[in-house]
From Swiss-Prot:
It holds the Pfam family HAD_2. This is Glyceraldehyde 3-phosphate phosphatase. Its EC number is 3.1.3.-. Its cofactor is Mg(2+). Catalyzes the dephosphorylation of D,L-glyceraldehyde 3-phosphate in vitro.
Amino acid sequence: MIKGILFDLDDTLYNSSEFVEIARREAVKSMIDAGLNIDFEEAMNILNKIIKDKGSNYGKHFDDLVKAVLGKYDPKIITTGIITYHNVKVALLRPYPHTIKTLMELKAMGLKLGVITDGLTIKQWEKLIRLGIHPFFDDVITSEEFGLGKPHLEFFKYGLKRMGLKAEETVYVGDRVDKDIKPAKELGMITVRILKGKYKDMEDDEYSDYTINSLQELVDIVKNLKKD
């Protein structure tokens, strides 16, 4: 009997890949306008290397970009980039079209709903609140809280424990095979892969019990599972 669902957040409940890329590009443009003396594409290459080396949750991407270009710290240019990034993020941050309706229907079935996500706790909560979907979830589990992230099995076990669920009575929904679907499947959860975001073309031969193009498809899957 299915008792709960764990969701990934980024590119599962909203389009993370698109808004982040647009926000970063607009931030760099604003920094150049504020005095960062560099070609736009060259600046983006440097920024993307910083993000790759330091990780997406590193808090000083723009600081490092300015230091790499100017050889010094410039608070005006850095702050310009930060403000532009956040303004664009707020303007673009929207749930996928069927996210809210799907969460409402699942909640009406009496299921426990949780989010398990890599990232800084405050950042991930900010996204959930801005998306307007935080009231649907019984718990939100972040890698920052636990100290390890995906694909570590212990992180997923911790999430199940926090939710008071067993793996075999839990559906897991995510977009990435390597970080979401594979570890969830290895623990015995029923896995649903949503084909969204930059990893939608990632090969998956054995780990997804179901694949969906829209969250709306999840409702019928769960209804059928609850019959078993």
